[in-house]
Curated annotation (Swiss-Prot):
GO terms for cellular component: ribonucleoprotein complex; ribosome. GO terms for biological process: translation. This is Large ribosomal subunit protein uL5. One of its GO terms (molecular function) is tRNA binding. Part of the 50S ribosomal subunit; part of the 5S rRNA/L5/L18/L25 subcomplex. Contacts the 5S rRNA and the P site tRNA. Forms a bridge to the 30S subunit in the 70S ribosome. It comes from the Bacteria. InterPro entries: Ribosomal_uL5, Ribosomal_uL5_bac-type, Ribosomal_uL5_C, Ribosomal_uL5_CS, Ribosomal_uL5_dom_sf, Ribosomal_uL5_N. This is one of the proteins that bind and probably mediate the attachment of the 5S RNA into the large ribosomal subunit, where it forms part of the central protuberance. In the 70S ribosome it contacts protein S13 of the 30S subunit (bridge B1b), connecting the 2 subunits; this bridge is implicated in subunit movement. Contacts the P site tRNA; the 5S rRNA and some of its associated proteins might help stabilize positioning of ribosome-bound tRNAs. The gene is rplE.
Length: 179
């Protein structure tokens, strides 16, 4: 069993049960999935840019991403409907816990001038969104092979009903929030 999942079942669940007075263990919020999305704006002019983004995302997530396509045509961006413009990957189960563990303990501390992640990035429904400016913070990415610094969005979807519950869940799992 993954280190973070073990921590969740042994420490986090009892702590949340006592703090929020849940009647049943099934009411305790848990992490449902993590979605990593990488928008590649250059893919319009340069289709090769998408291939490297897909490769990097595969290394980071440990599974193959889905290529996302444009929903509508936008003339200002020279964009046609159905053109590939990004990649996303949805992690669940073991891979999700492995990725979150790696993100919290290895990758986030490697961010330049890191003072903790924002407390305001909850969406009101108990989900947390985190923007990352460069993919180099992940240990799997080789600095020499990177042709362009790309950012990504990481969305942590939880079963929590309120932001407060979700914040408590992530704090107990070790997410470094700003003081």
């Amino acid at each position: 069993m993954n280190r973070l999942k073990e921590k969740y079942t042994k420490e986090v669940v009892p702590a949340l049960m006592s703090k929020f007075n849940y009647k049943s263990i099934m009411q305790v919020p848990k992490i449902e999935k993590i979605v990593i999305n990488m928008g590649v704006g250059d893919a319009v002019q340069n289709p090769k840019a998408l291939d490297s983004a897909v490769e990097e995302l595969t290394l980071i997530a440990g599974q193959r991403p889905v290529v996302t396509r444009a929903k509508k045509s936008i003339a200002g961006f020279r964009l046609r409907q159905g053109m590939p413009i990004g990649a996303k990957v949805t992690l669940r189960g073991e891979r999700m816990y492995e990725f979150l563990d790696k993100l919290i303990s290895v990758s986030l501390p490697r961010v330049r001038d890191f003072r903790g992640v924002s407390k305001k990035a909850f969406d009101g429904r108990g989900n947390y969104t985190l923007g990352i400016k460069e993919q180099l913070i992940f240990p799997e990415i080789d600095y020499d092979k990177v042709n362009k610094v790309r950012g990504m969005d990481i969305v942590i979807v939880t079963t929590a009903n309120t932001d407060e519950e979700a914040r408590e869940l992530l704090t107990l799992l070790g997410m470094p929030f700003q003081k």
